[in-house]
Amino acid sequence: MQRLGLGVFFVLVAASLSGCDSKPKTNPFEKKTDTVQPPPITEPPKPKGPPELTVSAEGPKVGWTYILLDKPDGKQKLAQAIGENAEYVSGKDVPLRADRNAKLAHVGEMISALAQGGAASVVVSTETRPEFPKTVKFASLASAKSAPACSVVAKVLTERRNAVWALKGGTAVKSPKGLAGPDMAMTQDSLEAAAHRCKDSDTVFVSADEDVEWGLVYDLAAATQKLEKAKLGRVVLIEPAPVAGRPVKLD
């Protein structure tokens, strides 16, 4: 019995040793691949080149970021976003696309922020009438503070009529209302007459009442660039708007 027990013991030991030496069977058709480590998580790459600047009904947008100007820190965030793109703004004619249904105040804030960021001018593009230019270059208000007192001022009124008068104040000549807004032909006649009375200035200041959409303001600015008998080479946006006929303070 003792010999039999020893024999069984040696058989079990041998079996266990042979089991340790044997390798697991592999599938001959299985492809061996190295383990690939996932790439480290990093911040998404920032887009190269100047950001697209737009103003829509939702408000100003710098690149992919909407700026909520109605928030207490809205103006600060707009200035910060423009400051982060200073290389594309400072000393440049900066392109800006503004939708017709954008708020005048929002477009005004964007133009003002770009001017404070060092832009030489802001070239605004807006859909308009076929006879008007598709872009208008706006100079900063600061660059026009020394404009002669006789300089031309034009404004779109709440009742969708245009008013034209001089920077120093005086009678505002109002155009009749057309089918799709102010009568632009009559407006251009008033602009030419006002420009002839001020030969020392080629500046025109444009604005509108608060409830007027940007598209009509753009039409007015564009009309100043298509005069046949006068030339108004510098366009400046005033916002908020002055009262028609009153002296305009360029603060």
Role assignments for model-derived ranges:
Residues 9-11, 201-202:
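Intrinsically disordered, low-complexity proline-rich regions
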